[in-house]
């Protein structure tokens, strides 16, 4: 059961559809308060039963696998055209080591190359770090290019250590990664 008080002061609700009913409840409360919705569509996670959650979101950051299954296309441009429909304000399709592609509703887009993790130790949590870093930039009203670069760089840094929270570890309290 979603507790509406969790949205007090929120500017964005980030959902992934994993707990569908809770996500729907949270989404309804966020919509009633005009809170922006972001959606995380991970690889292997698309299901028709969560399409409504995806389609209600404003900021859509999804893996290429999710984008292909949700759009029914394997062509990147065709996928984007289908997935950037209103109310979307932004679409990001991630491709891991091949970087990410960022689209605006007017169909302008760019490719953000991935940063190389050296050494590459563990990719656990890199997608979550990418999402969090990108959304930090989005909420800070950074240019999209800066959001994408920052997210890509921070995700690569996460892969240089063990576990999904490497970049948040006490051994590395600050990362001078802002561009």
Locations of regions flagged by a protein language model:
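Conserved phosphate-binding/catalytic region of the ribokinase-like
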Residues: 12, 74-179
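Ribokinase/PfkB-type carbohydrate-kinase core domain
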Residues: 1-110, 142, 170
């Amino acid at each position: 059961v979603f507790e509406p008080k969790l949205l007090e002061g929120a500017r964005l609700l980030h959902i992934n559809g994993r707990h569908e009913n809770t996500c729907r409840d949270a989404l309804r409360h966020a919509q009633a308060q005009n809170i922006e919705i972001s959606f995380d569509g991970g690889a292997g996670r698309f299901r028709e039963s969560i399409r409504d959650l995806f389609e209600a979101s404003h900021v859509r950051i999804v893996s290429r696998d999710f984008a292909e299954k949700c759009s029914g296309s394997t062509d990147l441009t065709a996928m984007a055209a289908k997935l950037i429909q209103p109310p979307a304000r932004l679409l990001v399709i991630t491709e891991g080591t091949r970087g990410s592609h960022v689209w605006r509703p007017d169909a302008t887009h760019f490719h953000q190359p991935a940063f190389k993790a050296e050494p590459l130790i563990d990719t656990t949590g890199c997608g979550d770090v990418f999402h969090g870093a990108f959304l930090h930039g989005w909420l800070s009203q950074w240019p999209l290019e800066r959001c994408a670069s920052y997210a890509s760089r921070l995700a690569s840094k996460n892969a240089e250590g063990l576990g999904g929270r490497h970049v948040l570890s006490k051994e590395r309290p600050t990362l001078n990664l802002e561009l």
